[in-house]
Amino acid sequence: MSENVMTLQVITPAGVVYDHHANYITARTTNGEIGILPNMISTITGLEIDELKVSRPDDETHVDYIAVNGGIIEIKDSLVTIVADSAERNRDIDVSRAERAKIRAEKALEVAKAEKKSDEIKRVEVALHRALNRLNVSSHN
Amino acid sequence: MGASLNEIKTKIASTKKTSQITGAMQMVSAAKLQKAESHAKAFQTYAEKVRKITTDLVSSDNEPAKNPMMIKREVKKTGYLVITSDRGLVGSYNSNILKSVISNIRKRHTNESEYTILALGGTGADFFKARNVKVSYVLRGLSDQPTFEEVRAIVTEAVEEYQAEEFDELYVCYNHHVNSLVSEARMEKMLPISFDEKGDEKASLVTFELEPDRETILNQLLPQYAESMIYGSIVDAKTAEHAAGMTAMRTATDNAHSVINDLTIQYNRARQASITQEITEIVAGASAL
């Protein structure tokens, strides 16, 4: 194993979603986008609901996309661990299910806005954001 | 030889049918158990990682914890999250857990206002309602392999009530799955979160770059940690439920088989007796001639 490689593990309650070597990762944290290279300083930070871009050492041109629903990222000794409520690789995403989730969330958002429930609006917006994120990631196929 | 031949025959037939049903239910439970076990295994890796990150984050901090989820408050009210099954036919699974909860509550509390119960599963909810114990939250109809999304409602509810100081500590009561024959009732303290009991874990010397700052990350991580621990016990309890169902159904099938054996012997004896009687009657009739 060369020096300039790190390991990325994405773990959810349903099991390990992604476990591969990587030489470059981009992620959107609560503080903005970060790029992660091997041997980076140990860091712990929160993630936004967004996509994760991973370029692997075995294929320079190929990029893996992973939809992550929030969670925490820990970087330590070239081991990058992401724990999230849920996460999906682009090839595993069920597009029709994500479409349906999006439509459902949009409808619920209208209802919530009509009833002016601020908590509900916030929750539905997060759900909508997740669905859009999944659709966005799946479009990278 | 009270029963007639026909009566015994119908009894045998109906017991046979029952044993077929329980046999099928045993196999269904066995399949579910296997699935639940692999699910629990997958979840274990997640729980370990969350725990590791949390300890990494907390151990590098020398100041006393400021996060509300870690501060030990004076205990005025205790919350119990009791996990039971929705349906019966699981042997002593439900009675085990409910008995241990009731005895624990009696030991610890003198007044009803000192505790509140969150019930997961219909049996537990009905049990407490029948005894006029206040149940503050009920979740029924959990699927056999509960997803994180499904249980999020009750988990978030528990965490929110804790944060709103509805109760000052939270225990989760469930049956821990040891193997397919053994499970044990457990009561675990989930909130406030403490890491004291894991004193053997070496505090990592690595200092972490924290963005934006410790408090913000803790605010995000600790609820996730608590949720994952509670979800872990639910998965564990479900596994135990399937195991209990399987064992109960196996016992039922075995019992049915022994009942059928006894009945068959009884049937044969009755048949024999009637034949003997018939012969005696014929012989007696012939000799009378």
Curated annotation (Swiss-Prot), chain A:
SUPFAM superfamilies: Epsilon subunit of F1F0-ATP synthase N-terminal domain
Primary site of residence: membrane
Compartmental location: Cell membrane
Keyword Transport part of the UniProt annotation: yes
GO molecular function ontology, one term from the record: proton-transporting ATP synthase activity, rotational mechanism
InterPro entries: ATP_synth_F1_dsu/esu, ATP_synth_F1_dsu/esu_N, ATP_synth_F1_esu_C, ATPsynth_dsu/esu_N
Topology with respect to the bilayer: Peripheral membrane protein
Gene3D superfamilies: ATP synthase delta/epsilon subunit, C-terminal domain, F0F1 ATP synthase delta/epsilon subunit, N-terminal
One Gene Ontology CC term in the entry: proton-transporting ATP synthase complex
UniProt keyword terms in alphabetical order: ATP synthesis, Cell membrane, CF(1), Hydrogen ion transport, Ion transport, Membrane, Transport
HAMAP family (alphabetical): ATP_synth_epsil_bac (MF_00530)
Function: Produces ATP from ADP in the presence of a proton gradient across the membrane.
Subunit text: F-type ATPases have 2 components, CF(1) - the catalytic core - and CF(0) - the membrane proton channel. CF(1) has five subunits: alpha(3), beta(3), gamma(1), delta(1), epsilon(1). CF(0) has three main subunits: a, b and c.
Protein family: Belongs to the ATPase epsilon chain family.
Protein's name in the database: ATP synthase epsilon chain
Organism the protein comes from: Lactococcus lactis subsp. cremoris (strain MG1363)
UniProtKB/Swiss-Prot annotation, chain B:
Protein topology in the membrane: Peripheral membrane protein
Summary of subunit composition and partner proteins: F-type ATPases have 2 components, CF(1) - the catalytic core - and CF(0) - the membrane proton channel. CF(1) has five subunits: alpha(3), beta(3), gamma(1), delta(1), epsilon(1). CF(0) has three main subunits: a, b and c.
Keyword Transport carried by entry: yes
Key word Ion transport present: yes
Main subcellular location: membrane
GO molecular function: ATP binding; proton-transporting ATP synthase activity, rotational mechanism
PROSITE patterns: ATPASE_GAMMA (PS00153)
Any Gene Ontology biological process: proton motive force-driven plasma membrane ATP synthesis
Record-linked Pfam families: ATP-synt (PF00231)
Family the UniProt entry places it in: Belongs to the ATPase gamma chain family.
InterPro entries (alphabetical): ATP_synth_F1_ATPase_gsu, ATP_synth_F1_gsu, ATP_synth_F1_gsu_CS
Name of the protein this chain belongs to: ATP synthase gamma chain
One CC-aspect GO term: proton-transporting ATP synthase complex
Record function comment: Produces ATP from ADP in the presence of a proton gradient across the membrane. The gamma chain is believed to be important in regulating ATPase activity and the flow of protons through the CF(0) complex.
Keywords from the named record: ATP synthesis, Cell membrane, CF(1), Hydrogen ion transport, Ion transport, Membrane, Transport
Protein localization: Cell membrane
